[in-house]
Every structure is written in C-alpha cells, then in structure tokens.
From Swiss-Prot:
This is Eukaryotic translation initiation factor 6. GO terms for biological process: assembly of large subunit precursor of preribosome; cytosolic ribosome assembly; maturation of 5.8S rRNA; maturation of LSU-rRNA; ribosomal large subunit biogenesis; ribosomal subunit export from nucleus. Monomer. Associates with the 60S ribosomal subunit. It comes from the Eukaryota. The keyword Lyase does not apply. It is found in: Cytoplasm; Nucleus, Nucleolus. It comes from Dictyostelium discoideum (Social amoeba). GO terms for cellular component: cytoplasm; cytosol; nucleolus; nucleus. One of its GO terms (molecular function) is ribosomal large subunit binding. Its main location: cytoplasm. Keywords: Cytoplasm, Initiation factor, Nucleus, Protein biosynthesis, Ribosome biogenesis. Belongs to the eIF-6 family. Disulfide bonds: none annotated.
C-alpha cells in the first residue's frame, strides 16, 4: 500500500527519506507529524531513525543502502555516523566513503541484489558498493541521465524509471536488474521518480501530489497489496476512461 505524504512544504519525500527492507532514515524536521506518520507506517517492522547527514536534512539524496549496508558521504560527521550505526540493526554495515559525487542517493539505485551507478563513479567506490551492499554493480544511465538514483526507484520486486525511457532501454534495464520495470511519474507528472517516492518490498511512501493513476502503477510494479505488474495497463486504461 502506498501512503501519500508531504515533508513540510515538499512533495519530494525521497529527498528526505531513505527506505530499505531493514531500516528507514528520516531527515530531521520541524514538524513531528511527518515523523509520526512514518513511524506509524513502519516502526512495527523496521527501525525509523531521525537524523541529519552532513548537517542537512536531505538524507535520501546523500545516502545509498539496502538490507545489507548503508553508504554515507565523507561529509557525514563522526557524531552522525555513530548515531546512525547505533540505531540500525547490527548486521547492517554502515560505511562512510570518499567519492567526488557526494550525493550518493542521486548516483546509486540499488535493491538487495543489484545496483545501477553513475557511469563516472570512482572505481574504488564501485568496489565498496559491491562489498558493503553485497550487490552486482552496473555503470548505467536511465533515459540518457547519469543520475540513476534520481530517475530509478528500485526494489526486489520491481523498478520505476524516467517516463521517457525507451522500450529498448526498459528491456535492457529489466534484464540487468532481473525485475519487472515500467516507465512512469510521481507527483502529478514529475520525472524524478526516486525523489518523489520511497519503496521497499512491502510498502511505499509517495509525495502528496501523486495521482491515483501514478499510485496504481507504483503499487502494481512493486507488487504491493498483491498487485501484479500485468495490472498496470488496466489501471491506466481505467483511469483514462474515468477522466473521459
């Protein structure tokens, strides 16, 4: 099931959240209503950690992680690193890395088995991603965009990518990732799909502007609430008929 939320005045929930199957990071915010809603949705299953990274709230864009590990930029302070380490399960490896692209969440899209990364990411960073996250790593673009972590939302169940991704590119990405994949949008047509939603294998949090049709596609491709990827066309067709 997908939950609509707004982080203060922003619908870009993926900028301020990092959600995996093992934990959720939440950027420190003045409004506790957002945090309480996230905790009510997730806290029975995984730890929800309110934190900052490099003194900022954009934890979703600065970090990359999965059930095995969490990667943080070298601008993350010692205090932040220690707090995050102490708050996550013991079997989650938390590592700070030296990388010129410090917005790791924009440059890495990962599930528990495979990761797409910015084509120009350091070779050493690629090795750390493979080691800490326990994934196979592919240097890739999404619809010609190098910021794969911005334009691809990925779980073990499926992937949502930039709406202008060609059918050939969708097929290639789906083959690499070994999951069903669809091109789509969030927040009423926004192309930055991973900035507008966070997803794991059983739930999704999407920006408050996300339409019913966009939510139907998200719930279908990520197999939430028992939806199947084959339902996507019917969901879109029904929405078009309703609008007509």
């Amino acid at each position: 099931m997908a939950t609509r939320l707004q982080y203060e005045n922003s619908c870009d929930v993926g900028v301020f959240l990092k959600l995996t199957n093992k934990y959720c990071l939440v950027g420190q915010c003045g409004s506790k209503q957002f945090l309480h809603t996230v905790e009510n949705r997730l806290a029975d299953h995984i730890p929800v950690v309110e934190t900052s990274i490099a003194g900022t709230r954009i934890v979703g864009r600065l970090s990359a992680g999965n059930k095995n590990g969490l990667l943080l930029p070298n601008t993350c302070t010692d205090q932040e690193l220690q707090q995050i380490r102490n708050s996550l399960p013991d079997d989650v490896v938390v590592q700070r890395i030296e990388e010129k692209f410090s917005a790791l969440g924009n440059c890495i899209a990962t599930n528990d088995y495979v990761a797409l990364v910015h084509p120009d990411i350091d070779r050493e960073t690629e090795e750390i991603i493979a080691d800490v996250l326990g994934v196979e790593v592919f240097r890739q673009t999404v619809s010609g965009n190098v910021l794969v972590g911005t334009y691809c939302a990925l779980t073990n169940q499926g992937a949502l990518v930039h709406p202008m991704t060609s059918i050939a590119d969708q097929d290639e990405l789906s083959s690499l990732l070994q999951v069903p994949l669809v091109a789509g949008t969030v927040n009423r047509g926004n192309e930055c799909v991973a900035a507008g939603c966070v997803v794991n294998d059983w739930t999704a949090i999407v920006g408050a502007d996300t339409t019913a049709t966009e939510i139907s596609v998200i719930e279908s491709i990520f197999a939430l609430q028992g939806s199947k990827p084959s339902n996507i066309i019917n969901n879109i067709r029904n929405s078009i008929v309703d609008n007509v």
